[in-house]
């Protein structure tokens, strides 16, 4: 069972599961072939989410790291209708005595959407709706500062954009996973202000 003290192994288990699920017997039935899983974006998305979650579990101690589930605030007078509402399930939440940082990981071959009629690009609307809903409805009885981060692998268009609304920040960030580990580590720590750029 994965728990706080061995959370890093959760990522390794995900890697092993990916290898297992991407293996198939060849025609002889005696050997395994490894399928090209890089075309399976759902598996890559789960692997990326697991990596980021376990990174913050392992590489820092300021924040508590979790993936909380919480309900929508809507209520029906009919109990059975309340059970029809889906829960909000976050990817990664970092929380200390002052801040709640909600990180939603995404994995796309194209980070931005392109409008064919105007030829303009923009962030994907469902991503923004999702992180905004999390920020508005996550339980926060102590009224901590809440911020949201949409984190993407860099697929050729580096992005680091921060927006503000009513003292809440939303950041869109890509990270290059093809760089040295120290650079990846520093970027992820800087993302939540655990180190500053001078230390990178």
Each model region followed by its residue ranges:
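Catalytic core segments in nucleotide and nucleic-acid processing enzymes
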Residues: 41-200
């Amino acid at each position: 069972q994965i728990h706080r003290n061995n959370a890093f192994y959760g990522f390794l288990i995900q890697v092993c599961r990916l290898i297992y699920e991407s293996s198939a017997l060849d025609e002889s039935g005696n050997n395994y072939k490894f399928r090209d899983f890089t075309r399976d974006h759902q598996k890559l998305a789960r692997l990326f989410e697991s990596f980021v979650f376990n990174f913050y579990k392992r590489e820092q101690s300021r924040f508590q790291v979790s993936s909380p589930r919480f309900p929508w605030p809507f209520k029906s007078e009919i109990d059975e209708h309340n059970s029809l509402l889906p829960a909000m399930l976050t990817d990664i939440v970092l929380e200390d005595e002052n801040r709640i940082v909600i990180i939603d990981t995404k994995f796309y071959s194209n980070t931005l959407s392109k409008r064919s009629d105007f030829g303009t690009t923009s962030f994907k609307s469902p991503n923004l709706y999702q992180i905004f809903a999390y920020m508005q409805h996550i339980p926060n009885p102590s009224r901590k500062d809440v911020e949201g981060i949409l984190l993407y692998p860099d697929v050729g268009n580096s992005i680091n954009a921060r927006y503000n609304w009513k003292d809440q920040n939303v950041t869109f960030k890509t990270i290059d996973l093809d760089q040295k580990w120290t650079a990846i580590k520093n970027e992820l720590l800087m993302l939540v202000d655990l180190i500053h750029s001078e230390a990178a």
